[in-house]
Amino acid sequence: MESAGFRSLEEDLSYSAGRLCQVWPNRFPDTQTAEACALRPEMLANRVYASRMGNGDEASGDGWRFRGRGLIQITGRSAYERFARAMTMTLDQAVAHAATRAGAADSAVWFWSFNKLNGLANTWSLDLITRKINGGTTGAAERNRLCAAALHAIGA
């Protein structure tokens, strides 16, 4: 869902204050708290991705540097380091590659393989796949609709 139907190759972090409260209620419990990051993508990425997923603290800039890219939107220094090793690239090359059409596909294939998602796909465990990719089930109804449409299109 974050890739906007595979049309976006980088995570869109331009959120209003109200939307920040919905997406990250623990980090932004009210609109007053969210105002500082509203419509400031770099500041937001550095705040919400700080000190997790292998990223440094907020001042390191890692949140922005390692924001979601690719068709599955790999996120965080640790994921990019693993992707770089798999692609035999430097970390900087892997980050740049994930934002290209070819790299967006490469990163999705790598993520799918690294996280062993074929087994879940074979059993149509869409919620479990979603949790592996995004940590929750945001967009589940739309994802289920799109999967049904894809199955219909191939006559399955």
Predicted regions and their residues:
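Cell-wall polysaccharide-cleaving catalytic domain and substrate-binding groove, primarily
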Residues: M1-H97, R101-A156
